[in-house]
Amino acid sequence: MQPRELHKLTLHQLGSLAQKRLCRGVKLNKLEATSLIASQIQEYVRDGNHSVADLMSLGKDMLGKRHVQPNVVHLLHEIMIEATFPDGTYLITIHDPICTTDGNLEHALYGSFLPTPSQELFPLEEEKLYAPENSPGFVEVLEGEIELLPNLPRTPIEVRNMGDRPIQVGSHYHFIETNEKLCFDRSKAYGKRLDIPSGTAIRFEPGVMKIVNLIPIGGAKLIQGGNSLSKGVFDDSRTREIVDNLMKQGFMHQPESPLNMPLQSARPFVVPRKLYAVMYGPTTNDKIRLGDTNLIVRVEKDFTEYGNESVFGGGKVIRDGTGQSSSKSMDECLDTVITNAVIIDHTGIYKADIGIKNGYIVGIGKAGNPDTMDNIGENMVIGSSTDVISAENKIVTYGGMDSHVHFICPQQIEEALASGITTMYGGGTGPSTGTNATTCTPNKDLIRSMLRSTDSYPMNIGLTGKGNDSGSSSLKEQIEAGCSGLKLHEDWGSTPAAIDSCLSVCDEYDVQCLIHTDTLNESSFVEGTFKAFKNRTIHTYHVEGAGGGHAPDIISLVQNPNILPSSTNPTRPFTTNTLDEELDMLMVCHHLSRNVPEDVAFAESRIRAETIAAEDILQDLGAISMISSDSQAMGRCGEVISRTWKTAHKNKLQRGALPEDEGSGVDNFRVKRYVSKYTINPAITHGISHIVGSVEIGKFADLVLWDFADFGARPSMVLKGGMIALASMGDPNGSIPTVSPLMSWQMFGAHDPERSIAFVSKASITSGVIESYGLHKRVEAVKSTRNIGKKDMVYNSYMPKMTVDPEAYTVTADGKVMECEPVDKLPLSQSYFIF
């Protein structure tokens, strides 16, 4: 079998699974519907009785809207399949595959030998659920029009194609440089281009005359490229010379008689805002629904320029001499530009181009050619050495950071990366009993080995050593060997003596201390543990307590200025299934036995509906600052991001708008609060926010691109150090990259170690220890971990006065009871995933 046949076999398996689900009355999600139709088309091709055209039609009537979830009607626009016909391999494209109400289940189940279910199993939903405004990722565009470059003068000009073939001219092409068979007054076109939307074109048919409007080029007004007729800086005094020369070369020129000229210039080109959003993505004051959540964001500002958007493609803007600068060295130009992205970050929700150089973000704003465009940002020059990632109608966030990782298996890295995580911070050595329970890499040999073994993986890595030692020599040795933090865990004994010793060493070496406190209350209650902190900064893991910690009141620590609190994701958010799964998780992770009553009591003491409910609200208030996974040790490494947004959705559902969003009709403040929980705040906490954690100039270019409809669930692309490390990719044998099956695959950027970072202690670098390991990743020291506090947690610095009833478990914050009901349905769930 060829590799492509294995990929098609995966498609067939999912298509077959979708058929079985359909036969028992399950309405299919987008992935299931796509796979069913695609795999059935493959089977029809195998019969050898149908042409490409036949199958393009047949694929449109298999499933009706009654057979799929309502959102599929708007999300499934086309399916592309390549299959082997009797005469070879050909592409079949199914446009609008869900375009009927009832479909044809005989076609959908052909060859499966499954019984055809009754249509009564698939009642239509309420009509409002099929409305576009209820679809995931819906963009609500402000009414009105957008004027393009309104301050520029317009010059109308008559143009006739004297050739025998059509001529199409793009928006930013220097009009004087156009085809020799276009006849017009070239003197009027000197230093000008078409007044049309960026990336569009005007087509001149043979013999046809059109009147078009021209506008002056901007920037340095340096003309390059084209036919080199007017090369150089625009100089009106050169017009006659340039026209004479081009006429000698055979280019047509027809001076316009003043009597034939229009009496006045035309008004600026106007684009309806809805069309603008389709072409370039939403702009200022447009609203976007995030995935299928109830969260709505408003674009606060657009840093691109209407009429000068940088657009790549055939006949579009980013071409030599137009949107791409000529004759500039690599040092002067971006390595990669991401164009027209909606950025969601703690710094704002806005639209901009993002410039990348040497793996770092060097510019955010307007990118392009300063020779011909105004307002090009510093360090934002697009040249022949610049690659382009088009992000129109996409969201860009910074790569997520999971700050609670048990490195139990290397496959976690692949799973985390595919969810949008680009930094994993924690400890472990593989599936040892110690690592299954704790995040500790406890000695130099294992630290060296873990740094080297993760060196080739496309993930930033930071390791934590074992901090449970009331002495200091081993703790120091672990930091000097490369650990970027120390972890205190109750399974190793989180006693006041160990806490004091660990924090003292962390203070000395400027690394973070992390703690899983004492559920047993063996040495002290929570008050004793807090006293042992001595007001020193510490990251308290799973501060609610189900993941471990003083029962029942570890959650009270969120009131203190030196506590940097986080949640782990099994309790995010509180649902009707949360409590029932926790006990078995806990027993496995912490090497407990159901045959030992004390083990069972220990486990049960950690699981409390009251504190989990309180955790929801404290996250929404910004009293708990971070969300992480606790990977394979009571947590899911691929769900940090999705469960963060589920928590935000549930809180909006039950608590309404936050005061800061009240009356705005959008959730910008809430979204900034939640995105900070897995980006900037864990980066600040662990001393790496000078390098990662936010979409800002100077940060390492770990960026995640999302389709609006898939936000929070499934990235379309992940960049590591400015290079694509993961993307949604079709059949590698396909004639185009969008042929089914589309899967998240690691790309070339995943195989360059220098696109990722190993975060280590400064001591391990200055001593030369890290250099001796021979790592290929970039190496960076953590810093400024000991002089921070809750006040530094962006959008998440609230410190309410906390109480917890030791018997009823009732939690209050600033005198208010923190209670909410569990939910039985959440977004970013069965609409997106197969299993």
Swiss-Prot record:
Keyword line: Cytoplasm, Hydrolase, Metal-binding, Nickel
Catalytic activity entry: urea + 2 H2O + H(+) = hydrogencarbonate + 2 NH4(+)
Positions annotated to bind substrate: 489
Gene, per the UniProt record: ure1
Family annotation (InterPro entries): Amidohydro-rel, Metal-dep_hydrolase_composite, Metal_Hydrolase, Urease, Urease_alpha_N_dom, Urease_AS, Urease_asu, Urease_asu_c
The keyword Cytoplasm belongs to this UniProt entry's keyword annotation: yes
Active-site residues, record numbering mapped to chain: 590
Post-translational modification: Carboxylation allows a single lysine to coordinate two nickel ions.
Family label: In the C-terminal section; belongs to the metallo-dependent hydrolases superfamily. Urease alpha subunit family.
Residues modified to N6-carboxylysine: 487
HAMAP family in alphabetical order: Urease_alpha (MF_01953)
GO molecular function: nickel cation binding; urease activity
Cofactor: Ni cation
Pathway linked to the protein: Nitrogen metabolism; urea degradation; CO(2) and NH(3) from urea (urease route): step 1/1
Keyword Metal-binding listed: yes
UniProt name for this protein: Urease
Biological processes per GO annotation: urea catabolic process
Subunit structure: Homodimer.
Protein location: Cytoplasm, Cytosol
